[in-house]
Amino acid sequence: MQEQYRPEEIESKVQLHWDENRTFEVTEDESKEKYYCLSMLPYPSGRLHMGHVRNYTIGDVIARYQRMLGKNVLQPIGWDAFGLPAEGAAVKNNTAPAPWTYDNIAYMKNQLKMLGFGYDWSRELATCTPEYYRWEQKFFTELYKKGLVYKKTSAVNWCPNDQTVLANEQVIDGCCWRCDTKVERKEIPQWFIKITAYADELLNDLDKLDHWPDTVKTMQRNWIGRSEGVEISFDVNDYADKLTVYTTRPDTFMGCTYLAVAAGHPLAQQAAANNPALATFIDECRNTKVAEADMATMEKKGVDTGFKAIHPLTGEEIPVWAANFVLMEYGTGAVMAVPGHDQRDYEFASKYGLNIKPVILAADGSEPDLSEQALTEKGVLFNSGEFSGLDYEAGFNAIADKLAAMGVGERKVNYRLRDWGVSRQRYWGAPIPMVTLEDGTVLPTPEDQLPVILPEDVVMDGITSPIKADPEWAKTTVNGQPALRETDTFDTFMESSWYYARYTCPQYQEGMLDSKAANYWLPVDIYIGGIEHAIMHLLYFRFFHKLMRDAGMVNSDEPAKQLLCQGMVLADAFYYVGENGERNWVSPVDAIVERDEKGRIVKAKDAAGHELVYTGMSKMSKSKNNGIDPQVMVERYGADTVRLFMMFASPADMTLEWQESGVEGANRFLKRVWKLVYEHTTKGEVAALNVAALSEDQKALRRDIHKTIAKVTDDIGRRQTFNTAIAAIMELMNKLAKAPQEDEQDRALMQEALLAVVRMLNPFTPHASFTLWRELNGEGDIDNAPWPVADESAMVEDSTLVVVQVNGKVRGKITVAVDATEEQVRERAGQEHLVAKYLDGKTVRKVIYVPGKLLNLVVG
């Protein structure tokens, strides 16, 4: 065994061993308990970042631990390979998205191997290959035949100069990111999947997810947004159709003083024909990109349409306004306004001088003061005719019943959730498998024409999708008739919604899933990824699982039993102010810092001498140039050190502050472990451990060893507090470093301890553990070794410390057998010289004994 710990030598050797022996490849085995450990698959951006390293290290620690428990562990990896960044990079580098993507995959695969992750590489998949997306296309056509897919027009961001659709992130301050042209809103036909058909189940089944973070479940509940209310129809003077609104507060209906419709509503369009101000307003709204998140903060604007609606209960005429806070995509595109009891309605009414009518009493029973804001709390109705005096629930029901009896109201359950728009007007995605015949008939692509392959050898101009620019690509024949293929591609959330299931049977050619394999491995036992995916990916992931279940492919209701959301990785951020006042961000690697006695940064400069402003710790990002390259760290310290620091520096679900001093500390610890094993093994053969012959000190050390095993097992397996597990191993190592090595039993005990330590470290530092296990002559390879089991008998305390008091004052502490009698404890106390001098010549008048803890002798 070499004396020095040299990770650069051992890590590549161990990785080669894993590759050659296919150590982590698994197949279904009904005789073993399965464990499916999955980290969210990466986008092949070109290089791994520390967020990846943290996510995948957590997964690998769990997978290796479960493997050591004797389970059949599946830990696969793949590539979420479609998406917009590849198009931008292709234009920038004068290439096509495919070669750029495949080059990145090859590079990042080597980086993952360099970090020692125990993946089953035989199951690797890339979502941009026809072998993968063909099954997604086939499934989409089946959903279409079931009535779960439809096409309708929907608003997109349109650049009139480039004649192309822009993603939201390509719209900068209302203008095109490429040519700075003002972006317009344009209605185009798009494909949707009816996720709303599963809204109730997606909501209710959250209650089955006991091991998902409450924050994620709350976010999904709010996103689905189930509400109970009443849909109400209004007659409108001089307008052919009724206006329908939905409200969750029918108790306030007598305070409805106006209606508001979206700018795109047919009523507003009709009114605009004779109203230039309204026509201008509609144009403004059409060209304003409004995310739902912005609605609460933006200025509320509107124009009176001139139409008057009839309040169904009072018969009063109320104005109908077009307003920018109503969206056609939500509900009916019309809302009823109760400015006395809704703050948004109040602000709008105040701005435009509309009637504000209070109909709910304040909590103290007085009329509400509406001089500055609306009263939004529920309460007793007043100013509401026959409904006055009713509380919220009674008022809700009475008004709902009355409207229903009149035929103008209907109780409804509504959802905030909207159907999933899966059309993207981009090139680098899976083609949507639909065709249009010459007579306008839309059909799914026949199965014998699947997959619809995306051509990879293309020229990118940065404006138009190559498959939209090439009229020949779209031409096809269906049932002997000429047809045109759909040139939109799938939203890339499609691919990431079912990849976890395809990992169970990546080579299967008979269909999307091999149900036997899928049902052996699924559901995923633990899924690891960032909380930023809470409502998009994780909702589609759950939805797709239910679709596959209803297609008979899987027999479980949910895709993953446990969800672990890892925290962000933070690093120091520095900048200096340039000549033009701009901020130039400097990498923390290049910052020369001075610290105070508490280790806080007080001064910093870079190599060029710029005085740096320190902005504190913030999320590693390109914009602040504070990312740390994992590859540089691995080359400097070794993969095991980086992994150990990642798991020790913070609980897995909390933010992690990157400190190179902490990495150095992890490296020093591994060197200490290596040194102790080296010193132990160079002393030659080790005798068998004779537990019965151990001295008190040896028993105490063995007790510490097995208590550590018990704690680390609980910390990793149940609590998933990996940092405290490592801390416990470090504490034990400190004791082992001081332990005597004088006789055979000392060395036998050290052998037992080191075999346990190396196995407990294996999930965290697999290369060093693999090597040290062999040096310690462990049985077989550590990858197949069982997790150490705590010996209960070793942890039993056979002695205990008793505090001895004389007249209530502590005079000594004695060690006695756990089962010692009171007489034996008194006798032992009398032999303790510190106690004996206080008893000399005195009579013991009373004895107070708390077994195993305290002996108080009252003397006089």
UniProtKB/Swiss-Prot annotation:
Major subcellular location class: cytoplasm
Keyword Protein biosynthesis applies: yes
Pfam families associated with the record: Anticodon_1, tRNA-synt_1, tRNA-synt_1_2, tRNA-synt_1g
Presence of keyword Zinc: no
Gene3D superfamilies tied to this protein: 2.20.28.290, 3.10.20.590, HUPs, Isoleucyl-tRNA Synthetase, Domain 1, Valyl/Leucyl/Isoleucyl-tRNA synthetase, editing domain
Keywords associated with the record: Aminoacyl-tRNA synthetase, ATP-binding, Cytoplasm, Ligase, Nucleotide-binding, Protein biosynthesis
Residues binding ATP: 622
Root EC class: ligase
EC number in record: 6.1.1.4
Localization terms from the record: Cytoplasm
One Gene Ontology term, aspect cellular component: cytosol
Motif ('HIGH' region): 42-52
Motif window: 'KMSKS' region: 619-623
An annotated GO BP: leucyl-tRNA aminoacylation
Catalysis performed (reactions): tRNA(Leu) + L-leucine + ATP = L-leucyl-tRNA(Leu) + AMP + diphosphate
Family: Belongs to the class-I aminoacyl-tRNA synthetase family.
Name of the featured protein: Leucine--tRNA ligase
Gene coding for it: leuS
NCBIfam families reported for this sequence: leuS_bact
MF (Gene Ontology): aminoacyl-tRNA deacylase activity; ATP binding; leucine-tRNA ligase activity
